[in-house]
């Protein structure tokens, strides 16, 4: 395997200009030229104003111009066309009585136990049972859900996001 090394270009601008000339698509009739000290703006590069919208762009080759004219013809024929779709069928109604939903499913998730009986939070050393409305870290009362109580028992003064939002709504945190 033979490797050839090309010398590094002396001027990056000249190198890019040469690459653009070598790789210029055939259907573009414009040439890259760096005239003046300021490069053309994006508006100048991409804002094409055609005198007649039906005439193909002078920058496109014959094949591209034909494809462009076919797309304009197809959109003109679709103007008066309306699509008739069937109406959406209504959702089936399910008869559910309130008696079929157990009451424990309607409780707030923050008050439901989130840990098993063997977990550290529900061990005999904890005094946390439910949501507390008073938050005073110096007194040592727990604030929030069982997960918050676990970290508060470890000495951290933190609560989870849901408990923070609930305390904020109740005006306990300012």
UniProtKB/Swiss-Prot annotation:
One of its GO terms (cellular component) is host cell nucleus. Transmembrane segments: none annotated. It is found in: Host nucleus. GO terms for biological process: regulation of DNA-templated transcription; symbiont-mediated perturbation of host cell cycle G1/S transition checkpoint; symbiont-mediated suppression of host innate immune response; symbiont-mediated suppression of host JAK-STAT cascade via inhibition of STAT1 activity; symbiont-mediated suppression of host type I interferon-mediated signaling pathway. Residues 40-48 are annotated as: Interaction with RB1 in competition with E2F1. GO terms for molecular function: zinc ion binding. Keywords: Activator, Early protein, G1/S host cell cycle checkpoint dysregulation by virus, Host nucleus, Host-virus interaction, Inhibition of host innate immune response by virus, Inhibition of host interferon signaling pathway by virus, Inhibition of host STAT1 by virus, Interferon antiviral system evasion, Metal-binding, Modulation of host cell cycle by virus, Transcription, Transcription regulation, Viral immunoevasion, Zinc, Zinc-finger. A motif (LXCXE motif, interaction with host RB1) lies at residues 106-110. Its main location: host cell. It comes from the Viruses. Disulfide bonds: none annotated. A zinc finger (unnamed) spans 145-163. Interacts with host UBE2I; this interaction interferes with polySUMOylation. Interacts with host RB1; this interaction induces the aberrant dissociation of RB1-E2F1 complex thereby disrupting the activity of RB1 and activating E2F1-regulated genes. Interacts with host ATF7; the interaction enhances ATF7-mediated viral transactivation activity which requires the zinc binding domains of both proteins. Belongs to the adenoviridae E1A protein family. Plays a role in viral genome replication by driving entry of quiescent cells into the cell cycle. Stimulation of progression from G1 to S phase allows the virus to efficiently use the cellular DNA replicating machinery to achieve viral genome replication. E1A protein has both transforming and trans-activating activities. Induces the disassembly of the E2F1 transcription factor from RB1 by direct competition for the same binding site on RB1, with subsequent transcriptional activation of E2F1-regulated S-phase genes and of the E2 region of the adenoviral genome. This is Early E1A protein. The lineage of its organism: Viruses, Varidnaviria, Bamfordvirae, Preplasmiviricota, Tectiliviricetes.
